[in-house]
Every structure is written in structure tokens, then in C-alpha cells.
Amino acid sequence: MMVKNICLACFMVVALVCGRAVNAFPLSNGDQVECHFSHGDKQGVATEIWNTYRQPEERNPELGRAVAVMRLDADGWPTIIIDGEAHKKNAKGSPAIWDFVYFHECAHAQDPSRGEIEANCAAYKEMSRRGLMNFHRMKDLEAVHLSMLMLPEEYGGSGLKLWHKTLECARKGDG
């Protein structure tokens, strides 16, 4: 019985480890990344939930109008929820945007008190650090931000302000 329990425990550990590796986010350069975090008494890899659905009504309501969000579960563990259908439709045509979205949500997972501008700043810096930012990608990200006319105040009030504050932060070294 003891051997059976040990084997079962080993199987569960392998399944968890392999499950996380399989669920790693695919960056536009082909790398697979996980969102590592450490805050409070918790550290590890943020959970990723790829929300796939057939009908819009089946879409995870936590997403609201976003393509990804970070939420803390009941135990305070960060969970990144990604609209898998939107990713399937748009990832090839706008790879910089998806890399940015992932690193933005990961920034929230790493520090849940981080605001939207600071999360944008952290995402921009992480992409730069990984060699994923260049003039064309920056312009793609800028175009997406500028298309957001009205945003809540925590985002700066508009996409223009959010993007301006993101670049300002990234150039200063804050975030």
C-alpha cells in the first residue's frame, strides 16, 4: 500500500510539472515562458488558464473585454487567464501584442499591487531584455494603444496617455 501511494504521489508530481511545461506561454520567437513570481509567503509559477470556447457565452466572464487578465485565486495564487480563441485568431498577425499582453499580466502576477501603467512598463522592459522589442514591434504596440480612446483612470484615461506613460516609465527605468 505504501509503495502504491509513493508511486501515485510521484505520478502526480510528474503530471503537475509536465502540465506546467505544456501550458507555458508561446512567445513569438518560439520560446516557451512561464511567469515566475515571489511575494508574501508564496513563490512559484503563476497558473495559466487558456480559455477555449465555441460560443461567446462560454467565454470566461473574468476576461470582460480583455484578451487576458490576472486574478488571485482563493489561496492568493496568481492565475493568468488567456482568451485562447483570440490568441488562435490573432497571434500570427500581431505577435508583439501577445508577447506584451503576457508580460503585462505576468507583471501583475509578480506584484498584484502593481498598477496598469507599471505593468505596461514592466512588459515593455521584459520584451526589450529578451530582444523582442524593435522599432516595428514598438509601433505595433503603439498603434494598439492609440486605438483605445477611452480607458478607466487607472490606465491613464486613454490609450494615448497609457502609451505615453509606459514609454516615459521604460525610459526612466521605473516599474
Where are the language model's segments positioned?
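Positively charged n-region of N-terminal signal peptides that target proteins for export
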Residues: 1-6
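Bacterial N-terminal signal peptides
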Residues: 7-17
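A metal-dependent hydrolase signature that marks the N-terminal structural subdomain at the beginning
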Residues: 21-65
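Solvent-exposed, acidic/flexible segments
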Residues: 91-100, 112-117, 156, 160
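Long, well-structured alpha-helical subdomains associated
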Residues: 130-175
